[in-house]
C-alpha cells in the first residue's frame, strides 16, 4: 500500500477538508499551514498552526481496499452542517429501522429503571404494548411525564463500539382505554410487523396488557465524534460543539 500517494493527494487537493478535521478534532477556531504527515490503516496524522500535531483515528480499522472510502467518509461526515434537513432525514431513517425501543422510567422510590418494549408507528404516532406485570408499567402509570426513549444501533452494525449511533427523546406516556378503536388498529399493525407470529396472536387477547401512546419531546442524536445534535420540542436541529471538538484531551487540562 502506497500511503505516500494518499499524503500527496490530500496535501495537494484537500486543504479545506483537512482544516475542518483539525478544527473539529483539535478544538481550534482557526487553522493555518495544515499538512498531512502520515497515514496508516488506523488514522491520519496532521501538523498545523506552526507545528501542532493531531492524530485523527478512523471510526474503524481500514485496509487497502477500504481506506480511500474511509477517508472520504471521514471528511464528508465532518463538514460543517449548512442544511439540517439532511440530518433530520437521517434521524427519521434511523428511528424507522427499529421495532423496539429502550425505556428509562422512574420506580416508586424515584430511581431510574431501564427496560425495553416493542414500539409501533401508526398514523403519525408511536405506541408501546406492555404487560401490567412488567416493572415499567407501574412506573409509567406513576410518572407518565418522566420517561426517556432511546434507539441504539446494534453493536454488530456499529463502526466502533464507542460511537454507536443513538437517538434519545424525553417523552410522555398516555394509556389508551381498551375500548378505544385505535387499540385494535395499532395491534393489527404490530401483528403485520411481526408477520403474525412471535406470540402477538396470544398477547393481544390478554386483558392485562395495555396500549400506551408515547409523545416525544426534546432529544439528542449522536452519529459519532463531533456529530451530536440537539432536537428541540418542535423537531428543529442544532449542532452541539460547533466551535471545535467538545471533548477535553489530557493535554488541554
Swiss-Prot record:
Q: Which Enzyme Commission number(s) are on file for it? A: 1.14.99.-
Report which superkingdom the organism of origin falls in: Bacteria
Question: What Gene Ontology terms describe what this protein does at the molecular function level?
Answer: coenzyme F420 binding; metal ion binding; oxidoreductase activity, acting on the CH-CH group of donors
- The answer to whether UniProt assigns keyword Heme to this entry is yes
Q: Which UniProt keywords apply?
A: Heme, Iron, Metal-binding, Oxidoreductase
One Pfam family in the UniProt entry: PNPOx_N
| Positions with a binding annotation for heme | 247
**UniProt key word Cytoplasm:** no
Q: Which InterPro entries match?
A: DUF2470, F420H2_bilvrd_red/Heme_oxyg, Haem_oxidase_HugZ-like_sf, Haem_oxygenase_HugZ, Pyridox_Oxase_N, Split_barrel_FMN-bd
Q: What family name appears in the similarity comment?
A: Belongs to the heme oxygenase HugZ/HutZ family.
The cross-references to PANTHER family, in alphabetical order and at most eight, read:
HEME OXYGENASE HI_0854-RELATED
NCBIfam families, alphabetized: heme_ox_HugZ (TIGR04109)
Q: What does this protein do?
A: Involved in heme iron utilization. Catalyzes the degradation of heme to biliverdin, with the release of iron and carbon monoxide.
For this entry, the protein name equals Probable heme oxygenase HI_0854
> Which organism was this protein described from?
Haemophilus influenzae (strain ATCC 51907 / DSM 11121 / KW20 / Rd)
Amino acid at each position: 500500500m502506497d500511503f505516500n500517494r494518499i499524503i500527496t493527494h490530500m496535501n495537494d487537493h484537500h486543504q479545506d477538508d483537512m482544516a475542518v478535521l483539525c478544527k473539529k478534532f483539535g478544538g481550534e477556531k482557526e487553522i493555518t499551514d495544515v499538512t498531512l504527515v502520515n497515514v496508516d490503516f488506523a488514522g491520519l496524522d496532521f501538523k498545523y498552526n506552526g507545528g501542532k500535531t493531531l492524530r485523527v483515528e478512523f471510526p474503524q480499522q481500514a485496509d487497502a481496499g477500504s481506506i480511500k472510502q474511509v477517508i472520504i467518509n471521514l471528511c464528508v461526515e465532518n463538514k460543517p452542517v449548512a442544511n439540517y434537513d439532511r440530518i433530520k432525514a437521517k434521524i427519521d431513517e434511523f428511528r424507522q429501522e427499529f421495532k423496539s425501543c429502550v425505556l428509562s422510567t422512574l420506580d416508586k422510590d424515584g430511581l431510574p429503571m431501564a427496560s425495553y418494549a416493542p414500539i409501533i408507528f401508526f398514523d403519525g404516532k408511536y405506541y408501546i404494548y406492555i404487560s401490567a406485570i412488567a416493572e415499567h408499567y407501574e412506573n409509567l402509570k406513576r410518572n407518565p411525564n418522566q420517561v426517556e426513549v432511546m434507539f441504539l444501533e446494534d453493536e454488530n452494525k456499529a463502526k466502533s463500539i464507542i460511537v454507536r449511533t443513538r437517538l434519545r427523546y424525553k417523552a410522555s406516556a398516555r394509556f389508551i382505554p381498551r375500548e378505544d378503536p385505535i387499540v385494535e388498529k395499532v395491534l393489527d399493525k404490530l401483528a403485520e410487523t411481526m408477520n403474525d407470529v412471535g406470540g402477538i396472536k396470544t398477547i393481544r387477547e390478554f386483558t392485562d396488557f395495555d396500549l400506551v401512546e408515547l409523545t416525544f419531546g426534546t432529544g439528542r442524536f449522536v452519529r459519532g465524534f463531533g456529530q451530536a445534535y440537539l432536537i428541540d420540542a418542535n423537531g428543529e436541529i442544532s449542532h452541539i460543539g460547533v466551535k471545535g471538538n467538545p471533548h477535553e484531551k489530557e493535554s488541554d487540562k
